[in-house]
Amino acid sequence: MSKIEQKNQSEVIKLAIDLMSRASVTPEDAGCQKLMAQRLAQLGFTNESMIFADTTNLWSRRDSTNATKEDDLVFCFAGHTDVVPAGNLELWNTPPFEPTIIDGMLYGRGAADMKGSLAAMIVATERFVQDHPDHHGSITYLITSDEEGPFINGTTKVIDTLEARNEKITYCIVGEPSSTHAVGDIVKNGRRGSISAEVDIKGKQGHVAYPDHVRNPIHLAMPALTELSQVQWDNGNDYFPATSFQLSNINAGTGATNVVPGHINALFNLRYSTELTDQIIVEQVESILDKHQLDYDIKWTFNGKPFITEHVESEHGFLNAVSQAILSVTGTETQLSTSGGTSDGRFIAPTGAQVIELGPCNATIHQVNESVSCDDLEKLVDIYYHCLVNVLCTHKTIS
């Protein structure tokens, strides 16, 4: 895209291009947060950079000048500046870190996940503060460069810092690409919990011709793994489908056909609803392994607990405020969903915050030729703007 063409673009497209031009492959930030902080500082935000190990985080806050009970409200935009690697550059039609507009679509790594959302948040906030400088409550930003990586030094560390200071978030919009066919058609009002395990089941190695001298760990493991795959963990509920157990890796053997291996290693994951806890899952899995009298070691990884922001039958509910914002911009009713993977919302929700995810369409995320509709980004600015208005310009505390 030429400089002349860039000058003709709207504010949200220009900012998205600026952010996308920075190769912030996780955990790098590549100056994205500095750019955002500069824009926010001009609006009266106080910026705090929180650096943990290799991760850069930004906590930015603008407080109300009013002294009313509504000013206890803290509205947060949350997101990440890091992106996944571009992969094979030969498969891209355009360079992944040279944003290009073709037929109304903005192409480049991070277009949908989630630098387009970050640009829309900033532009919406600029417009809102200009129109409503005396708004109620506080507007905050929680931005990390460690969402696509191991999620160790990112949002979770920022939340720990805020909790230690008793600094709370009331309502949070995570800008993950939640939409499916059109911007705003899907809002994620929760996510399933995720728990993973690596189990190493021991046997006795030996020659296949002498079965009396071996204990085949593959034979020993398969009945237990089969039983785990057939467990009806729960029936789900109004917000979540039934819990899912999936084996993702099984490894055993030396590569020789005449050697019984000494152990088998299996990886599995459960995506679970609010009907279960991680402790219940651990106990049930290990009881099944014990029932089959296996000699095993198991390592658990707790990726995040399930969370839900429930719909409240009130015109002042947070979900209603978001839904009305979408309706006013797109003319369509949004649908609520808890499907898909995890997000950093799982670290924010346990503090008591009401958390939703709202962003552009997700059809091309993590793929080559990732893209986002320019028109959708314009609409997303309007949606975020109306969310701010609906939450911070009412004189009634929303539920």
From Swiss-Prot:
One GO BP annotation here?
lysine biosynthetic process via diaminopimelate
On the tree of life, the source organism's domain of life is: Bacteria
Q: What Pfam families is this protein classified in?
A: M20_dimer, Peptidase_M20
Instruction: Identify the Gene3D superfamilies for this entry.
Output: 1.10.150.900, 3.30.70.360, Zn peptidases
Cofactor needs: Zn(2+); Co(2+)
Q: How does it assemble?
A: Homodimer.
The protein's name is Succinyl-diaminopimelate desuccinylase
Q: What is the lineage of its organism?
A: Bacteria, Pseudomonadati, Pseudomonadota, Gammaproteobacteria, Alteromonadales
